[in-house]
């Protein structure tokens, strides 16, 4: 199981939101690249980066920082937030981003998913953000008509190999992950499930490992010091 430290970028800074609310922001660093390098030094095998401005506007906004990250970090970076076209995917992969995450665009534009998976294969990951079991879109501002599990199965049929499953109600709350929802998702699909949202301590890492997810994205708990990255990586092995 891989631990993915999360670096969320807003206005060029490394921040954390509570439940995706843009007015509930805590700034942790003015230098997201340095933050990524810090997690790498502590043993991270992979970095999870989100362009929050991009998620909100539908277009990548923090390109210079993201490009610098891809160049300076020795570990792979997966990026989400505002990726809505095949051209954007191609540009990001050319800049050295290892994997891109399609969220809102996967819901609104299944043709894009089909084309992206066909062209870029494993370099495309599907982000499924759920609110009460329903898929949420556009920076979590709206709920779609899809159930999270139904949508995951649809993405698997289209050829997706990995999904990132976020429980919005838990995100940034340090309330513990929704283990039941994660377990249901793992059992429902035959592809890799990366869990996101609510991780607060080492016990949550152990519990998620038992559920059978292939990876865990950790944000706030690393920044508050409630979770030690080295210990989390050790437990995840």
Curated annotation (Swiss-Prot):
Keywords: Amino-acid biosynthesis, Cytoplasm, Histidine biosynthesis, Isomerase. Its EC number is 5.3.1.16. InterPro entries: Aldolase_TIM (IPR013785), His_biosynth (IPR006062), HisA_bact_arch (IPR006063), Isoase_HisA-like (IPR044524), Isoase_HisA-like_bact (IPR023016), RibuloseP-bd_barrel (IPR011060). The keyword Amino-acid biosynthesis applies. Transmembrane segments: none annotated. SUPFAM superfamilies: Ribulose-phoshate binding barrel. One of its GO terms (biological process) is L-tryptophan biosynthetic process. It catalyses: 1-(5-phospho-beta-D-ribosyl)-5-[(5-phospho-beta-D-ribosylamino)methylideneamino]imidazole-4-carboxamide = 5-[(5-phospho-1-deoxy-D-ribulos-1-ylimino)methylamino]-1-(5-phospho-beta-D-ribosyl)imidazole-4-carboxamide. Pfam families: His_biosynth. The active site is at 8 (proton acceptor), 129 (proton donor). Pathway: Amino-acid biosynthesis; L-histidine biosynthesis; L-histidine from 5-phospho-alpha-D-ribose 1-diphosphate: step 4/9. GO terms for cellular component: cytoplasm. Its main location: cytoplasm. GO terms for molecular function: 1-(5-phosphoribosyl)-5-[(5-phosphoribosylamino)methylideneamino]imidazole-4-carboxamide isomerase activity. It is found in: Cytoplasm. Belongs to the HisA/HisF family. HAMAP family: HisA. This is 1-(5-phosphoribosyl)-5-[(5-phosphoribosylamino)methylideneamino] imidazole-4-carboxamide isomerase.
């Amino acid at each position: 199981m891989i631990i993915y430290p999360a670096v969320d970028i807003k206005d060029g800074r490394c921040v954390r939101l509570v439940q995706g609310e843009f007015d509930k922001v805590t700034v942790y660093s003015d230098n997201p690249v340095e933050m990524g390098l810090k997690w790498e030094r502590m043993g991270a095998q992979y970095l999870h980066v989100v362009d929050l401005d991009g998620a909100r506007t539908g277009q990548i906004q923090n390109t210079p920082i993201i490009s610098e990250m891809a160049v300076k970090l020795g570990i792979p970076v997966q990026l989400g937030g505002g990726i809505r076209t095949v051209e954007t995917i191609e540009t990001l992969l050319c800049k050295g981003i290892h994997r891109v995450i399609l969220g809102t665009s996967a819901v609104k534009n299944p043709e894009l998913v089909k084309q992206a998976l066909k062209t870029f294969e494993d370099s495309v990951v599907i982000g499924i953000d759920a609110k009460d079991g329903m898929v949420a879109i556009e920076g979590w501002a709206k709920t779609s008509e899809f159930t999270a599990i139904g949508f995951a199965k649809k993405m698997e049929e289209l050829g997706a190999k990995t999904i990132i499953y976020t429980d919005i109600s838990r995100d940034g709350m340090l309330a513990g992950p929704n283990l039941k929802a994660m377990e249901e998702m793992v059992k429902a699909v035959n592809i890799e499930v990366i869990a996101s949202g609510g991780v607060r301590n080492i016990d949550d890492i152990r519990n998620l490992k038992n559920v059978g997810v292939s990876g865990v994205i950790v944000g706030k708990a690393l920044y508050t010091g409630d979770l030690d990255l080295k210990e989390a990586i050790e437990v995840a092995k």
